[in-house]
């Protein structure tokens, strides 16, 4: 369900490249939705999911470019250590902090899965691609912000 907007929003896709092929699929899904919606977007890459919220915060403070919303894309696969919980929990918490405390429109497409098979099931085009869902969510949140008076 592509959002119909009365404005031409500009979004930033922040993509973690830790799992390159999975990231490619998530990005393709997000880009497809944004292109079909007729909005403009930029893409930046970061090393991993933990860096996504910081990149969004940096972009938000930049006064030379304005983004109406953000799409966070990445993949965290459980390993043998506690690192999975740290990355999954803290990247999600930091995105929620940005959403709630700074009122940013963010679509979260960071996969947090048990194994690579689950990641592919959520990243492949034409299936349950979470990149498209994240882009749709960002567009929806931009529309809600406009509805409730954010006229930037």
Swiss-Prot record:
Residues bound to (2S)-2-hydroxy-3-oxobutyl phosphate: 80-81, 122
GO CC annotation: cytosol; riboflavin synthase complex
Keyword flag Transferase: yes
Say which domain of life the source belongs to.
Answer: Bacteria
| Pfam families, A to Z | DMRL_synthase
Q: Where is the active site?
A: 83
The reaction(s) this protein catalyses? (2S)-2-hydroxy-3-oxobutyl phosphate + 5-amino-6-(D-ribitylamino)uracil = 6,7-dimethyl-8-(1-D-ribityl)lumazine + phosphate + 2 H2O + H(+)
Q: Which InterPro entries match?
A: LS, LS/RS, LS/RS_sf
Quote the function comment for this protein: Catalyzes the formation of 6,7-dimethyl-8-ribityllumazine by condensation of 5-amino-6-(D-ribitylamino)uracil with 3,4-dihydroxy-2-butanone 4-phosphate. This is the penultimate step in the biosynthesis of riboflavin.
Matches recorded under PANTHER family:
6,7-DIMETHYL-8-RIBITYLLUMAZINE SYNTHASE (PTHR21058:SF0), 6,7-DIMETHYL-8-RIBITYLLUMAZINE SYNTHASE DMRL SYNTHASE LUMAZINE SYNTHASE (PTHR21058)
Question: What protein family does this chain belong to?
Answer: Belongs to the DMRL synthase family.
List the protein's name: 6,7-dimethyl-8-ribityllumazine synthase
Q: Which organism is it from?
A: Bartonella bacilliformis (strain ATCC 35685 / KC583 / Herrer 020/F12,63)
């Amino acid at each position: 369900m592509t959002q119909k907007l009365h404005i031409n929003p500009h979004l930033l896709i922040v993509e973690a490249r830790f799992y390159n092929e999975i990231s490619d699929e998530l990005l393709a899904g997000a880009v497809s939705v944004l292109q079909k919606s007729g909005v403009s977007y930029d893409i930046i890459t970061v090393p991993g999911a933990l860096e996504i919220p910081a990149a969004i915060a940096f972009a938000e403070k930049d006064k030379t470019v304005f983004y109406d919303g953000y799409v966070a894309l990445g993949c965290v696969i459980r390993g043998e250590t506690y690192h999975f919980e740290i990355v999954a929990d803290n990247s999600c918490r930091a995105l929620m902090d940005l959403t709630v405390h700074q009122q940013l429109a963010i679509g979260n497409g960071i996969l947090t899965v048990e194994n690579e098979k689950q990641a592919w099931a959520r990243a492949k085009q034409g299936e349950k691609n979470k990149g498209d869902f994240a882009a749709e969510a960002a567009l929806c949140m931009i529309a809600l912000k406009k509805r409730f008076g954010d006229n930037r």
